[in-house]
Amino acid sequence: MAQSVAATTNTSSAKPRLAVVYFSKSGNTESVAKAVQAMTGADIFEVKTVKPYPEAYKPTTEVVKEELEKNIIREVQPIDIDLSKYDVVVLATPSWWHHTAMPLQTWAKAQNFSGKLVLTCNSHGGGGLMHTREDFEKILKPTGARLGTHLTVEGSVRTNSKEVRNWRIANGVLAK
């Protein structure tokens, strides 16, 4: 069960330094990431694959299903980010076949989140939370990350910005 965890920084009066890292295919997850950035002033980073997914929806779902079933690692492009500069890291993913998208999993598994407050969120087209939080817990707990609560958003956040704002506040990540 997720619990609210207030963000802490190296100095008690300083605002937490935030980074948002996301993977998005259709743009829904990108809208969540950009909403968090707009509300907090966070630095934002996009995970991109070396080999793109098919443009059309159905072929993409078939490729993604095979990747998940066979644990196929899709190579991701390097991101110029130094996580040691951040107190809070927001990870945003689409829910693909009820799981965290493999490109974000690939990127996150290669990072050191020790001592960081990590907030996780997923967008979906009707499937809900499913296993995305469990996926994040499996990836992040061994790194020493402190997990905040998880946010699940259906579609984009154009109509859910209040939900994103409440999630940030519940985790001690206030507006800029």
How should each PLM-predicted stretch be described?
Residues 119-158:
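Short, glycine-/small-residue-rich phosphate/pyrophosphate-handling segment
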Residues 106-109, 136-138:
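Glycine-rich, phosphate-binding/catalytic loops in enzymes
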Residues 18, 117-119:
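Hydrophobic beta-strand segments of well-ordered beta-sheets in folded domains
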Residues 84, 109-115, 127, 141-142:
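Short, conserved loop/helix-junction motifs that constitute active-site signature segments
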Residues 2-91, 98-100, 105, 163-176:
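N-terminal beta1-alpha1-beta2 submodule of the flavodoxin-like/Rossmannoid cofactor-binding fold
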Residues 42, 116, 145:
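Short glycine/serine/threonine/alanine-rich loop segments
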Residues 91-92, 120:
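Redox-cofactor binding/interface segments in oxidoreductases and associated redox assembly factors
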